[in-house]
Each structure stands twice: as C-alpha cells, then as structure tokens.
C-alpha cells in the first residue's frame, strides 16, 4: 500500500518575504546578495523565487542553490507558480497566482507542499483559504512601479483582508520599513518587499530594517 505524504503542521510562517523577479535573478552576484539577506532574516524570512523568463533547468539550479543556503540560514525558499520546481527541489512552499493551477490540484499533486495564494481582495483571500491555501499575499497596498497607474489601496485594505480570513496575511506593494509596524497592528502577519530590499545599496541592512519593525 502506497503511503501518501501528509503536510506537516505549518510552523511559524516567516514575517519578512524578500520577493525576486527575473531582473534580480539574473544580476551578477545574486546568490551572494541572497546569502546576506537570508543570513539576516534567518527563520523569520523567506526568499520568493519568482521568474517568468528563466528556462526550467536554470530555475531548478538556482532554486537548489538557494535551498543550500536555507540549510545554513533557515530562511525559507518559496517558488512562485512553478509547482514542479518547488516539488523537485524540496522548497518550503509554493506561491500561486490567479494564473497558476488551483490550490486543490496542487494538493492532489503535492499533498505535503505548503501553499500561498496571491490575492487582491477580501473575497479572493476568503476563496483561497476555503480552497486550502496556508497563507495569502495581499496587495498591492501602496503605489508600486510594478503596477503603474493603479491606485493605491492604503493600509485599510489589509484590515479588510484580515477580517475576512483566519490564515496569515502577508502585505505587499510599495511597502517600506516605516510601513511595517502599522500593517502588523492592522493584523498582517508580515510583509513582502522587492525593491525596498534588493535595490538598496546595502540589502542586508535593508532586510534588517524590515525585520526590526515586526
């Protein structure tokens, strides 16, 4: 009889999520910077490996390299969208978007894999929780270059999402260190950032600024 893996109870979800993109992943010295950020954040942090352009072998190799750093730092590695890469590499989780395969389908393929869902409204957050996701990343909260022309929702958006669900909510979108404490007071479990960490002259120091506000 085949034994089906069972998802372990989720330990404390990291509070600071350093999200990447293709431009960041292809920068010279990316792994060196990632090591510094992961060392600062430790088990309170997660690196999100998010790519739309890298071929599968490259993304697989990069994810494995980051998971080697996870062994030293305990900082999580979460793969965006690519369930196959997350499962093959043994990542701590996968982050799904509205373009990804559905949460129940991921659970059928990989019952032990932790699942996050990217949402843009309280209703989407509620649907994600009911589908079986372990957390949601909700945004965007403030103006961000990745969504030009889209009005900011402000911190009250997080109040509405938190009120709709019982699982952890991670706020994303134009979030700077000085926003973190207010968002946590509004019920967010933590925050996600891209430019605020990776584009800083000292990414390690930037990561520590975010962490100090939780």
Spans of model-derived segments:
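Short acidic/polar capping segments at secondary-structure boundaries
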Residues: 142-143, 175-177
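Phosphate-binding beta-alpha-beta segment of Rossmann-like dinucleotide-binding domains, i.e.
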Residues: 138, 143-149
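C-terminal binding/interaction regions
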Residues: 186
């Amino acid at each position: 009889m085949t034994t089906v893996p069972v998802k372990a109870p989720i330990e404390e979800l990291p509070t600071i999520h350093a999200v990447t993109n293709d431009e960041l992943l292809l920068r010279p010295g990316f792994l060196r910077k990632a090591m510094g950020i992961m060392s600062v954040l430790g088990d309170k942090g997660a690196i999100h490996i998010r790519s739309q352009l890298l071929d599968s072998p490259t993304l697989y190799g990069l994810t494995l390299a980051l998971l080697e750093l996870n062994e030293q730092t305990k900082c999580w590695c979460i793969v965006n969208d690519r369930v196959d890469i997350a499962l093959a590499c043994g990542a701590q989780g996968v982050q799904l978007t509205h373009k990804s395969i559905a949460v129940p389908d991921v659970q059928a393929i990989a019952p032990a894999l932790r699942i996050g869902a990217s949402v843009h409204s309280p209703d989407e957050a509620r649907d994600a929780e009911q589908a079986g996701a372990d957390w949601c990343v909700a945004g965007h909260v403030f103006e961000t270059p990745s969504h030009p022309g889209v009005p900011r929702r402000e911190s009250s958006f997080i109040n509405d999402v938190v009120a709709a669900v019982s699982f952890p909510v991670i706020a994303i979108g134009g979030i700077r260190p000085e926003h973190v404490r207010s968002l946590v007071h509004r019920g967010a479990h933590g925050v996600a950032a891209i430019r605020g960490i990776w584009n800083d002259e000292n990414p390690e120091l930037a990561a520590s600024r975010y962490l100090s506000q939780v």
